Amino acid sequence: MGNVLAASSPPAGPPPPPAPPLVGLPPPPPSPPGFTLPPLGGGLGAGAGTGRGSERTPGTAAASAGGTADDGACGCLPNPGTFEECHRKCKELFPIQMEGVKLTVNKGLSNHFQVNHTVALSTIGESNYHFGVTYVGTKQLSPTEAFPVLVGDMDNSGSLNAQVIHQLGPGLRSKMAIQTQQSKFVNWQVDGEYRGSDFTAAVTLGNPDVLVGSGILVAHYLQSITPCLALGGELVYHRRPGEEGAVMSLAGKYTLNNWLATVTLGQAGMHATYYHKASDQLQVGVEFEASTRMQDTSVSFGYQLDLPKANLLFKGSVDSNWIVGATLEKKLPPLPLTLALGAFLNHRKNKFQCGFGLTIG
């Protein structure tokens, strides 16, 4: 979707280094104590609606079994979650590539307001500084969820990423995101999502320009067929002067107590993931991607090892391109410090990359 957003923007002269797609905005800073930021891609949390089916996720056998029994007793199916979250459970197991040195300082100014400072030093790209702000409103829907949520991030060149998320009513959530590159307005999009008892529907409008006649429209729908099976689809329509097109994809998700299988099939190719929770400490995932445009396929294996007593989180991965990577996160109580180490090795290109990070607060 990010590529289509970029394609729908009107051509311009040679700008500074291209900004990342709007959909791939950097993750927001951690929320203030006592609150949890909602998923930026949608997905309603607890307390969003009354009498609605609860979303079923793998890894909670007792809760899932109880929820399934209740749904069956009242003739209701569980909510399938959002289309954008179909592959997220597996992707979260894979380590994020690190390079250089990164220092992050988080400071909570109140229960609703937090700021953070990030300095990144790189040997490959440009070093940069980011200032981030997070505000969580007073409309509390659950002990860990409140609205509206405002997240902003600005770097040393003046480029801004900002998002506003708000719960408009039971089951209805909206989001607005903007992106600037120095003094130029690059991207903006508006999302609307409705979560029913057994389905989720979402619409995204990106970079609309009535005068030029360009823009992008994305529609998602996911429906529970059985307590374990959900089916849905995605329609992407983009238009700009001299070009117009639409791409459709179908998706299926099968969920059991401790594993989740998802497949997405469309004109661009195929994407399949498998997530398995082996124990409270170990989770594994397999990802398969096939691109019709690139005529290429790849398979990746990732795992996550969580040792709460040691305050340790380890992630590792290996793929069919012989790229091996790992990250290690270690909390250092009683100090509010988190140490992160990462390394990636590409055997085919004989390239090695490593990084070090420290988070305070």
From Swiss-Prot:
<keyword id="KW-1000">Mitochondrion outer membrane</keyword>
<comment type="subunit">
    <text>Forms part of the preprotein translocase complex of the outer mitochondrial membrane (TOM complex) which consists of at least 7 different proteins (TOMM5, TOMM6, TOMM7, TOMM20, TOMM22, TOMM40 and TOMM70). Interacts with mitochondrial targeting sequences. Interacts with TIMM29; linking the TIM22 complex to the TOM complex. Forms a complex with BCAP31 (via C-terminus) which mediates the translocation of components of the mitochondrial membrane respiratory chain NADH dehydrogenase (Complex I) from the cytosol to the mitochondria.</text>
</comment>
<dbReference type="InterPro" id="IPR027246">
    <property type="entry name" value="Porin_Euk/Tom40"/>
</dbReference>
<dbReference type="GO" id="GO:0030150">
    <property type="term" value="P:protein import into mitochondrial matrix"/>
</dbReference>
<keyword id="KW-0472">Membrane</keyword>
<dbReference type="GO" id="GO:0005743">
    <property type="term" value="C:mitochondrial inner membrane"/>
</dbReference>
<comment type="similarity">
    <text>Belongs to the Tom40 family.</text>
</comment>
<dbReference type="Pfam" id="PF01459">
    <property type="entry name" value="Porin_3"/>
</dbReference>
<feature type="compositionally biased region" description="Low complexity">
    <location>
        <begin position="1"/>
        <end position="10"/>
    </location>
</feature>
<dbReference type="GO" id="GO:0005742">
    <property type="term" value="C:mitochondrial outer membrane translocase complex"/>
</dbReference>
<feature type="compositionally biased region" description="Gly residues">
    <location>
        <begin position="40"/>
        <end position="52"/>
    </location>
</feature>
<dbReference type="GO" id="GO:0008320">
    <property type="term" value="F:protein transmembrane transporter activity"/>
</dbReference>
<dbReference type="InterPro" id="IPR037930">
    <property type="entry name" value="Tom40"/>
</dbReference>
<protein>
    <recommendedName>
        <fullName>Mitochondrial import receptor subunit TOM40 homolog</fullName>
    </recommendedName>
</protein>
<keyword id="KW-0653">Protein transport</keyword>
<dbReference type="GO" id="GO:0044233">
    <property type="term" value="C:mitochondria-associated endoplasmic reticulum membrane contact site"/>
</dbReference>
<dbReference type="GO" id="GO:0005829">
    <property type="term" value="C:cytosol"/>
</dbReference>
<feature type="region of interest" description="Disordered">
    <location>
        <begin position="1"/>
        <end position="71"/>
    </location>
</feature>
<keyword id="KW-1134">Transmembrane beta strand</keyword>
<keyword id="KW-0496">Mitochondrion</keyword>
<comment type="function">
    <text>Channel-forming protein essential for import of protein precursors into mitochondria. Plays a role in the assembly of the mitochondrial membrane respiratory chain NADH dehydrogenase (Complex I) by forming a complex with BCAP31 and mediating the translocation of Complex I components from the cytosol to the mitochondria.</text>
</comment>
<dbReference type="InterPro" id="IPR023614">
    <property type="entry name" value="Porin_dom_sf"/>
</dbReference>
<feature type="compositionally biased region" description="Pro residues">
    <location>
        <begin position="11"/>
        <end position="36"/>
    </location>
</feature>
<feature type="compositionally biased region" description="Low complexity">
    <location>
        <begin position="59"/>
        <end position="71"/>
    </location>
</feature>
<keyword id="KW-0812">Transmembrane</keyword>
<keyword id="KW-0813">Transport</keyword>
<dbReference type="GO" id="GO:0006626">
    <property type="term" value="P:protein targeting to mitochondrion"/>
</dbReference>
